[in-house]
């Protein structure tokens, strides 16, 4: 309980910085006006078709990115990595095989099966590919997405 009391005494800015460092953002920019809030609320959701399914970009701003991915059973994304982007994937529905490695060789990559309720962190530089074992909905929470930061090593669907 003492720890909670100490946290409650911290300044708002100190809490923002501490929380930001915990999630890798270095700080969180608060919404300072109703205009800021309306700007985020009014941004349209971007629909991006993919060979393996589709992405719905819920948010992609300077501080973070949030997407909903649908991957059709048996389909896969490319084996790729990002030099800037740090990602966490959460399986909302379905199941995937997640291949991951810091090496460029998919054949020697580790594999983990993720099912509903599972999550996995993919740090900057980690090569990764998902393959859907059944139709899957996957949330991606990450730092900002830049298309030029996707380095594809092996083609997906």
Give the positions of each predicted feature.
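A short, N-terminal "cap"/entry segment at the start of jelly-roll beta-barrel domains
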Residues: 1-65, 112, 155-157
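Conserved short histidine dyad/triad with adjacent acidic residue
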Residues: 67-85
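Glycine- and acidic-residue-biased ligand/ion/polar-headgroup-sensing regions
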Residues: 83-104
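Short acidic-glycine-tyrosine-enriched beta hairpin
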Residues: 102-125
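Double-stranded beta-helix
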Residues: 103-106, 127, 131-157
């Amino acid at each position: 309980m003492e720890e909670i009391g100490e946290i409650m005494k911290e300044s708002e800015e100190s809490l923002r910085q501490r929380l930001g460092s915990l999630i890798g953002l270095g700080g969180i920019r608060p919404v300072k006006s109703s205009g800021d809030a309306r700007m985020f609320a009014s941004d349209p959701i971007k629909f991006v078709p993919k060979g393996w399914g589709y992405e719905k970009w819920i948010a992609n701003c300077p501080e973070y990115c949030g997407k909903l991915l649908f991957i059709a059973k048996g389909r896969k994304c490319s084996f790729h990595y990002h030099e800037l982007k740090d990602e966490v994937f959460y399986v909302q529905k379905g199941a995937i095989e997640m291949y991951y490695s810091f090496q460029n060789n998919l054949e020697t990559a580790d594999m983990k099966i993720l099912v509903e309720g599972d999550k996995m962190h993919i740090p900057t530089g980690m090569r990764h590919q998902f393959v859907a074992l059944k139709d899957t909905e996957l949330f991606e929470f990450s730092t900002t997405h830049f298309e030029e930061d996707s380095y594809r090593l092996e083609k997906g669907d």
